[in-house]
A protein has these predicted regions:
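ABC transporter nucleotide-binding domain
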Residues: 196-289
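ABC transporter nucleotide-binding domains
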Residues: 27-30, 37-218, 222-231, 237
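C-terminal coupling/interaction segments
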Residues: 2-15, 292-331
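Residue-level "edge-of-site" marker
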Residues: 154, 283, 317
Length: 331
């Protein structure tokens, strides 16, 4: 069953993405091996090694961290000053054939505003020499919910969100195995963002390799299974955001704990090896700072049993992606 077969879903989700072609090289992996890129004397990307496979991966980092440069290296727009970049087993730089595999949605507004949306997507289909450019164009427009009268208006009349969607349609028209998106949600309203996130999820589930950057951290947290954190041109951390946070042992984790006897529990926790500090909240409960996530989790249960205290809630207070990002940048 595809999403088209689910009653009431097509209007929201659009046509189901085609499975990514397997190809001779298997899954379309992106491999960066000790990659560095200089702009003059400025190091934009510094000795990054990573492998990205099928699914959705988020690039996270402050402005100027090197995210766009990294995407341009993967898309073959820039050559590595050192190291190698391959996509689906092919060298990315100076290789026009790579564009059969890659779809790119750049951050800047790289559209021909005098064309209609349909003409712009169709022109991309023809550049790829697709056998049925008209059908491919219609399918791509439907995937981004632009298969309306708006498709036949000039792009210069579009809102920012509509321009973003038409760029995504052009990137998808040839059904690439790899999709690279730089700040793809800019200008989209909440419904459009929800639809685009659902589309990227479904593409990832169908075996495509999706890499996107976003300055809206909640979207990265909701959308991507894997996060690559880029800080000052370096790969600062890699994994899901909870794993990244737990690996950062140089700073304490903060927990909100509610129990049947907060004072007794607080007194028993003070001085324990895994606990760095305890505060009683005026509204009830404890705020506990712990240096070792796993050790504290085990010790808290043991202490509660010893004191005859019933635990009502134990919640990490600082595991949002915003918190992870703040810690990584600060360090």
């Amino acid at each position: 069953m595809t999403i088209d077969d689910i009653p009431g879903q097509r209007e929201i989700a659009g046509p189901a993405p085609a499975p990514a072609p397997a190809g001779a090289g298997g899954p379309a992996e992106i491999v960066l091996d000790n990659v560095t890129h200089w702009y003059g004397n400025v190091v934009a990307v510094n000795d990054i090694t990573m492998t990205i496979g099928p699914g959705v991966t988020g690039l996270l980092g402050p402005n100027g961290a090197g995210k766009s440069t990294l995407l341009h290296l993967v898309s073959g727009f820039l050559s590595p000053s050192r190291g190698t970049v391959t996509v689906a087993g092919q060298t990315a730089w100076h290789n026009p054939g790579i564009y059969k595999v890659i779809g790119l949605v750049p951050e800047r507004d790289s559209v021909y505003a005098f064309l209609t949306g349909r003409q712009f997507v169709a022109a991309t289909a023809k550049l790829h020499k697709l056998p049925d450019a008209e059908a491919a164009t219609a399918r791509a427009l439907a995937m981004v919910e632009m298969d309306t009268e708006a498709a036949d208006r000039r792009i210069e009349t579009y809102s920012k969100g509509m321009r973003q969607r038409i760029k995504v349609a052009a990137a998808l028209v040839h059904e690439p195995r790899v999709l690279l998106l730089d700040e793809p949600f800019n200008g989209m309203d909440p419904r459009q963002r929800m639809h685009m996130m659902d589309l990227l999820h479904r593409l990832g589930d169908a075996g495509h390799t999706i890499v996107f950057s976003s300055h809206i951290l909640e979207e990265v947290e909701r959308l991507s299974g894997t996060v690559q954190v880029i800080v000052a041109g370096r790969l600062a951390a890699s994994g899901d955001y909870r794993t990244i946070r737990r690996l950062m042992t140089s700073r304490p984790h903060v927990f909100q704990v509610a129990s049947s006897d907060d004072r007794a529990l607080a007194a028993a926790l003070i001085g324990r090896p895994s606990v760095n500090g305890v505060e009683l909240n005026p509204a009830g409960g404890l705020e506990v700072r712990a240096g070792d996530y796993g050790a504290f989790s085990r010790e808290l249960a043991a202490v509660a049993r010893e004191q005859g205290v019933r635990l009502r809630a134990v919640l990490p207070a600082d595991e949002s992606l915003e918190s992870v990002f703040t810690y990584l940048v600060a360090s």
